[in-house]
Amino acid sequence: GYSIKDSSQTKLLDYAASNIQSSYAYSIVPVGDGQMLGIADFLADKDAKLVAYRKVEPGEVREKTVLTYGTLQLDDRVKDAVMQFNQNNTQYEIRFKDYSEEEDPETAFAKDVVSGNVPDILDVTGMSVRQYVEKGLLEDLTPYYDQDEEVNVEDLIPSVAEAMKMDEKYYYVCPAFLISSLVGKEKDVGANIDWDVRQLMQFADQHPSARLFYDTEKKDILNILIAYNISKYVDWKTGECTFDKEEFRGILEFCNRECDSQDGTENEAELLRNGKVLLKPVVVGAEDIEIYRAMYQDDIAFAGYPNEQGRGTYFVFQHQLGMSSQSKNKEGVWEFLRMFMKLDYQGKIQDVNEMNAAAPT
């Protein structure tokens, strides 16, 4: 509140303490007797809601066991889920440890790990999950799945469940996924392509009047090819790196030869339709398939990136959330993690996703 008389300010509402995500709460007005009304538009719901807020004295607030949520990049959807968990759970409350606010986020996180100050909930999205597993940092969630009457591994898409598994165990939950691949016209790449780098270079030779990619720099394709196959070059247990294999030399040759960046002034969709550009690196969800079919104006195929195994289409997991093996409140952590895998949450994923049309797991 603001006083015109003396220009003083008075806190009327504490968003964080009230478990309100300010970016989705608006038009809040006082209606007297310590109450306020406002509109809340949660990501997890399709419709806005009228919400009543009531002032509570500190002594009336029930104490809860605090769970810490550690992340290098805080996502609005997770914030929304945490707020709803805090509102509905009478025993536990989650508080954020956002390492992105630190000058060196990864170093700050590493220091907490070394000192034993590990958050209860770990957001390992895009991180080296296997490395954390081998260090014993993540709890095996398989027993929690097995004992849960509502959330089961059997409910996951089989191929997704297999990709999430490490040494026959599950170390994180993941509510949604995308697909990373190379897309092209089916008549060019074939309906079922398994190729290595040499075969992809031969494919390029068969189309001398076209280029493989529209405007993709060498370093970007190199990064993708290494990132998706990093375990072939790095032994996380010993720290030994092997970059002198024939396959890796082939990758370097491929990137140097086929990935020259263009000026990007030409119309990409037109070049794809006319066969002047053959492939496009994409990260897609289920609804995006029709978009690319319309872009090509033809039947399309997801050919995948080249590798020696011939399986170069990869899952991109959104929100990989794990449990610290050092947590003293593991049951509470599971109460939060399981929320993402329940049917009611899974059923709303495609309705609320603002980026790609991620598919529920």
For the regions a language model picked out, list residue spans one by one.
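Hinge/lid segment of periplasmic solute-binding proteins
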Residues: 127-181, 198, 299-306
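Helix-loop-helix "hinge/cap" segment bordering the ligand-binding cleft or interdomain interface
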Residues: 164-266, 325-331
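Short, solvent-exposed loop/beta-turn-alpha elements that line the ligand-binding surface or hinge
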Residues: 142-155, 212, 231-251, 304-314
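Extracytoplasmic/periplasmic substrate-binding proteins
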Residues: 257-335, 347
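Immediate post-signal peptide segment of exported/extracytoplasmic ligand-binding proteins
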Residues: 52-68, 205-208
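Early extracytoplasmic/lumenal segment of secretory-pathway proteins
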Residues: 66-129
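Mature extracytoplasmic/periplasmic domains
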Residues: 6-36, 41-48, 53-61, 319-361
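Alpha-to-beta junction loops
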Residues: 113-122, 210, 273-284
